[in-house]
Amino acid sequence: IVAHEHFQLASFRNLKGIHLNGRNPAAPAGFTGHVSRSCHSLEEVVKYKATCDYVFLSPIYDSISKEGYPSAYTTDSLQKARQAGIIDAKVMALGGVTAAHFPEISSLGFGGAVLLGDIWKRTGTDFIGHFKELLRTASLF
């Protein structure tokens, strides 16, 4: 578990760490645990990656959960970012991600993928089967 708010929770046992974003841009003074961060540009990845265990880069694809929130990147721009060492194993792809995107995300050098809308929109037995397929496909990373 990673706390995205209420960073005081990170002092409890079994929490992985904290997640920084625009509302919570800095770790508490003296915090020495796991830190991740949301980034919405390649410039932010360059700025924050070295001080985090990993970062989320979004939106890679048109958002599923946020209607009208389009991708901010082309495949070409992401390939160039990989070649420049910006995208690497510490960068996770977020935004519009489905299992069908895993091969491309992996080939672009991302360390993994973050799914929100693809999971949130599933219910019942469809959810369980879909989750099993995600686990099988995630072996690409």
Predicted region positions:
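Electropositive phosphate-/nucleotide-binding environments in soluble metabolic enzymes
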Residues: 75, 99, 125
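SAM-dependent methyltransferases
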Residues: 140-141
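Active-site regions of enzymes building and remodeling cell-envelope glycoconjugates
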Residues: 14-19, 31-37, 51-54
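Charged helix-capping and loop-helix junction motifs
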Residues: 69-79
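Short, conserved loop/helix-junction motifs that constitute active-site signature segments
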Residues: 28-32, 84-86
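Glycine-rich phosphate-binding active-site loops on the catalytic face of alpha/beta enzymes
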Residues: 20-29, 56-69, 102-137
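Histidine/lysine/aspartate-rich catalytic loop segments that bind and position anionic ligands
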Residues: 38-66
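Catalytic cores of alpha/beta
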Residues: 1-16, 40-51, 78, 82-87, ...
